[in-house]
Amino acid sequence: MNGLKPFIAKVASGQALTRDEAADAFNILMSGEATPAQIGGFLIALRMRGETVPEIVGAVTVMRQKMLPVIAPTDSIDIVGTGGDGTGTYNISTLAALIVAGAGVPVAKHGNKALSSKSGAADSLTALGVKLDIDPSVIGRCISEAGVGFMFAQLHHSAMRHVGPARVELGTRTIFNLLGPLANPAGVKKQLLGVYAPEWVIPLAETLRDLGSESIWVVHGNGLDEITTTGTTQVAALEQGKIRSFELTPGDFGVAQVELAALKGGDGEYNAKALRAVLEGEKNAYRDVALCNAAAALVIAGKANTLADGMALGAQSLDSGAALKRLETLITVSNGGHSA
């Protein structure tokens, strides 16, 4: 159990690990070769000193090597948030994923149970009837037949079980809150990634660039790990190897600004009903914010040239019933059936 000690000592002294050192350290963590005290000490030392891009790249590289992969179309996109923003909003990225799928772009969505809200994407999807505990081959079928597949993080990152108890006992954010969305089991190169704090917007864009992503936006919206309609969203966009930073307001999408209360969610059942209501035609603040995120994803995917185009495509996906059809097919295929 001495393998992690030199890395703990280096980080505790205020020094940064190289990419290779970080990979070695996280390989020890995720192979069950460190004690709970060592895991906690290492993670808190990293957090106190501040995680660097090479350290995150090294850690993600190990996670990707150890994950259970899913085969998906090469043009698939992921719409995912780190969670943990503490705002208790409804599942914006889940609804956005269905809208994007309805617009013809395959979505390989990575998600988890709730971190700080009452209901994570997994909770809502389960309430809708989507089966999550399924083989990678079935998830691949979901993506090819329904246009969207949901990958439950616990099932694809079993190596995380070695650090899970220590993370729970620490009870505070660590580097692992950032890693999950960076280790999509389908290996997507296109992504709309929301982060819980604005200081991570540019570093995570740099991380994904160094990991070989092609087209990504990392966003933080006025306290949310999503594009928001409550105020300004900060964006770092990776396009053709270059990162540019900019801000977006609700007006850039042609929607009204709202108070955070309008985006609040509830438990899995509540959020599932709210999501289905929008898919069935209800026009409200939930619809607007999901459309904003879907519009950005459609631009990232190359399906729309502008946000206005993306909003129009997203609205068409909802109003035509295409997004709802994607959900119904996802429910059928995930439960072992065949799409019509």
UniProtKB/Swiss-Prot annotation:
* Residues binding anthranilate 1: G81, N112
List residues binding 5-phospho-alpha-D-ribose 1-diphosphate: 81, 84-85, 89, 91-94, 109-117, 121
Q: Which reaction equations make up its catalytic activity?
A: N-(5-phospho-beta-D-ribosyl)anthranilate + diphosphate = 5-phospho-alpha-D-ribose 1-diphosphate + anthranilate
Name the needed cofactors: Mg(2+)
InterPro entries for the chain: Anthranilate_Pribosyl_Tfrase (IPR005940), Glycosyl_Trfase_fam3 (IPR000312), Glycosyl_Trfase_fam3_N_dom (IPR017459), Glycosyl_Trfase_fam3_N_dom_sf (IPR036320), Nuc_phospho_transferase (IPR035902)
Q: Which family does it belong to?
A: Belongs to the anthranilate phosphoribosyltransferase family.
State the taxonomy lineage.
Bacteria, Pseudomonadati, Pseudomonadota, Alphaproteobacteria, Hyphomicrobiales
Q: Quote the record's binding site residues for Mg(2+) 1.
A: S93, E226
Q: What does this protein do?
A: Catalyzes the transfer of the phosphoribosyl group of 5-phosphorylribose-1-pyrophosphate (PRPP) to anthranilate to yield N-(5'-phosphoribosyl)-anthranilate (PRA).
Q: Which residues bind Mg(2+) 2?
A: D225, E226
Q: Tell me the route in metabolism or biology where this protein functions.
A: Amino-acid biosynthesis; L-tryptophan biosynthesis; L-tryptophan from chorismate: step 2/5
Q: Which residues cross the membrane?
A: none
The GO terms describing molecular function are:
anthranilate phosphoribosyltransferase activity; magnesium ion binding
- State the source organism's domain of life: Bacteria
The free-text note explaining how the cofactor binds reads: Binds 2 magnesium ions per monomer.
Q: What is its EC number?
A: 2.4.2.18
What does UniProt give as GO cellular component? cytosol
Instruction: List keywords of the entry alphabetically.
Output: Amino-acid biosynthesis, Aromatic amino acid biosynthesis, Glycosyltransferase, Magnesium, Metal-binding, Transferase, Tryptophan biosynthesis
Instruction: From the Swiss-Prot or TrEMBL record, give the protein name.
Output: Anthranilate phosphoribosyltransferase
Q: Name one GO biological process term.
A: L-tryptophan biosynthetic process
UniProt: anthranilate 2 binding residues: R167
Pfam name, any one: Glycos_transf_3
Subunit info here reads: Homodimer.
